[in-house]
């Protein structure tokens, strides 16, 4: 029997409110998960509205069965980085009224030890979002060079001890391969001297491996550009990030597309001409969860929501 894990959608009301739902609009939930955000969007859509959800996790696709009788809903099995391709295949490019992206790992993924995402639960070192394809974390750790591991840990996990940890992994795998999450987490805890308060020593390394295995930052970049390409004028983009690497990408993307093209000083270009190149308008400042939400759901603590609106296309 399949074990069920509860998932609480983060910043639910704020994220959907940011989409400014129109009853007959067309919306994308690029990270379906267990359907919390999708359910809220469907509640606000009218009978002629439409929601296209995307997820590469087979368990998320199975969870989408809850909406099988709702003709306004459809699910696509794939990565959110390809959302523009899916929209183009449906003939809806430039007609999307809102795109929602939640970059967090869902609670069911973290809580299911068999998925291998958690350093707190012993399970196989997998970490693939789509566990039907691709290289597992264990396979990568078995073959990666010390320099490659150190680069991944530092770049994707901002781990200060990246090189030391990489060397220790390489030394230990000579005795036995790393096949279980507990083996890797225990090694990192054992060799880490300056431990951060209230943070497991393996947090950054596990994050880094997960990001690398799933090409998450590349997917995020493609998803943001894809959302910009498919949104209709005045369409909204609501994006939830969970760590600084993600949030910096989102912040810079919105800023870059809301400021217009930079031109060398002195060129005879008017403000109006520069404004034509602006594609987005930031909708207020970043939104963080309330104290009450964090008390209900500790995993919401690091979440950040940013909202932007698509400006009219250049004539």
UniProtKB/Swiss-Prot annotation:
Keywords: Cytoplasm, Methyltransferase, rRNA processing, S-adenosyl-L-methionine, Transferase. GO terms for molecular function: rRNA (cytosine-N4-)-methyltransferase activity. The keyword Cytoplasm applies. GO terms for cellular component: cytoplasm. The keyword Cytoplasm applies. It is found in: Cytoplasm. Specifically methylates the N4 position of cytidine in position 1402 (C1402) of 16S rRNA. This is Ribosomal RNA small subunit methyltransferase H. The gene is rsmH.
């Amino acid at each position: 029997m399949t074990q069920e894990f509860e998932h609480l959608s983060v910043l639910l009301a704020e994220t959907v409110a940011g989409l400014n739902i129109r009853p007959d609009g067309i919306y994308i939930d690029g990270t379906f998960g267990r359907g919390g955000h999708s359910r809220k969007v469907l509640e606000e859509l009218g009978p002629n509205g439409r929601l296209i959800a995307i997820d590469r996790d087979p368990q998320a696709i199975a969870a989408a069965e809850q909406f099988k009788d709702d003709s306004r809903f459809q699910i696509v099995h794939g990565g959110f980085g390809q959302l523009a391709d899916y929209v183009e295949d449906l003939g809806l490019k430039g007609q999307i009224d809102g795109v929602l992206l939640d970059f967090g790992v869902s609670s069911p993924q973290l809580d299911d030890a068999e998925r291998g995402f958690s350093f707190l639960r012993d399970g196989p070192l997998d970490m693939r979002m789509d566990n039907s394809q691709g290289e597992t974390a264990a396979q990568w750790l078995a073959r990666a060079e010390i320099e490659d591991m150190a680069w991944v840990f530092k770049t994707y996990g901002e781990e200060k001890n990246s090189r030391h940890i990489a060397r220790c992994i390489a030394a230990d795998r000579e005795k036995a391969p790393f096949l279980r999450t507990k083996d890797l987490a225990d090694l990192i805890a054992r060799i880490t001297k300056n431990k951060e308060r209230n943070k497991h020593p393996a947090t950054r390394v596990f994050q880094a491996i997960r990001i690398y295995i799933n090409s998450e930052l590349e997917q995020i970049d493609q998803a943001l550009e894809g959302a910009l390409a498919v949104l209709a004028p005045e369409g909204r983009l609501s994006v939830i990030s969970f760590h600084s690497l993600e949030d910096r990408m989102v912040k810079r993307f919105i800023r870059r597309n809301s400021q217009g093209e930079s031109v060398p000083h002195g060129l005879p270009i008017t403000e109006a001409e520069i404004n034509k190149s602006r594609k987005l308008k930031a909708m207020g400042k970043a939104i963080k969860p309330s104290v009450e939400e964090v008390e209900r759901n500790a995993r919401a603590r690091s979440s950040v929501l940013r909202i932007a609106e698509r400006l009219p296309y250049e004539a």
